[in-house]
A protein has these predicted regions:
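Positively charged, small/polar-rich N-terminal and surface patches that mediate targeting and assembly
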Residues: 1-116
Length: 116
């Protein structure tokens, strides 16, 4: 079964937990793992070094667009990390993941279900 792993970082544990909670409450992610790390990166002409928290976000391919939009609206960084990796999982894990996510919103132009 297919799933998507999305990576982003936040400035500290509190911000990472708040972002994770919002994404989970909106059922855009089934699980989010948090890990403290040291990051070295280029920013505005300098090399920066910061403690950050990596978020490993597990979601479905169908929820990816809504997740990306929500994450970019909520994120504390001007340019948040957004890396997406396709992945495979067991059928059992995939069933749990799917049941944890809300159905994606219809895209413009998609036909509405009869009776709606």
């Amino acid at each position: 079964m297919k799933l998507v792993l999305a990576l982003t970082t936040e400035a500290n544990q509190a911000k990472a937990e708040a972002l994770a909670a919002q994404l989970l409450e909106q059922h855009l992610a089934a699980c989010i793992a948090l890990q403290q790390q040291q990051s070295l990166y280029h920013w505005q002409g300098r090399i920066e070094r910061d403690s950050e928290v990596q978020l490993l976000i597990k979601t479905s391919p169908e929820q990816l667009e809504a997740l990306q939009i929500a994450l970019h609206q909520m994120h504390s960084y001007d340019v948040p990390e957004w890396i997406v990796l396709p992945a495979e999982c067991s059928d059992g894990y995939g069933s749990w993941l799917t049941s944890s996510l809300k159905p994606p919103l219809p895209k413009p132009g998609d036909a509405a279900e009869p009776g709606l």
